[in-house]
Amino acid sequence: MIEALLVATGGFFGAITRFTISNWFKKRNKTSFPIATFLINITGAFLLGYIIGNGVTTGWQLLLGTGFMGAFTTFSTFKLESVQLLNRKNFSTFLLYLSATYIVGILFAFLGMKLGGI
């Protein structure tokens, strides 16, 4: 039961944080590139890498990794925004978004793990 509470608590704060950051960026960004989701996802990749690389206890992994990072990052919005770019025939932005999200996300997860392991 305590494990579920840790995940739920982390998830609550992760979702609220993503909502706040996403809305802040969307009000200020008028380009076709979905910068809010991109920054949220690469930040989340780095932080999750750092958490895991740091070797935190299972409780902290549940609270921060599964709960907070699980709700903070958003795979579904990334996919939806990618499809929307395709539907608008914005192919160059689509390719940039797709490739940058995967390449930078993996790089940031790696860096987070390395820095967390120091």
Curated annotation (Swiss-Prot):
Topological relation to the membrane, as annotated: Multi-pass membrane protein
Signal peptide region: none
InterPro entries reported in the protein's UniProt record: FluC
GO CC annotations on file: plasma membrane
Catalytic activity: fluoride(in) = fluoride(out)
Family annotation (Pfam families): CRCB (PF02537)
Entry keyword annotation includes Membrane: yes
A biological process from GO: cellular detoxification of fluoride
Transmembrane segments annotated in the record for this chain: 1-21, 33-53, 55-75, 93-113
Regulation (activators, inhibitors): Na(+) is not transported, but it plays an essential structural role and its presence is essential for fluoride channel function.
UniProt keyword terms in alphabetical order: Cell membrane, Ion channel, Ion transport, Membrane, Metal-binding, Sodium, Transmembrane, Transmembrane helix, Transport
Broad class of where this protein is predominantly found: membrane
Sites where the protein binds Na(+): 70, 73
Subcellular location: Cell membrane
GO MF entry, a single one: metal ion binding
HAMAP family: FluC
Function in brief: Fluoride-specific ion channel. Important for reducing fluoride concentration in the cell, thus reducing its toxicity.
Similarity field: Belongs to the fluoride channel Fluc/FEX (TC 1.A.43) family.
Protein name from the UniProt record: Fluoride-specific ion channel FluC 2
Gene behind the chain: fluC2
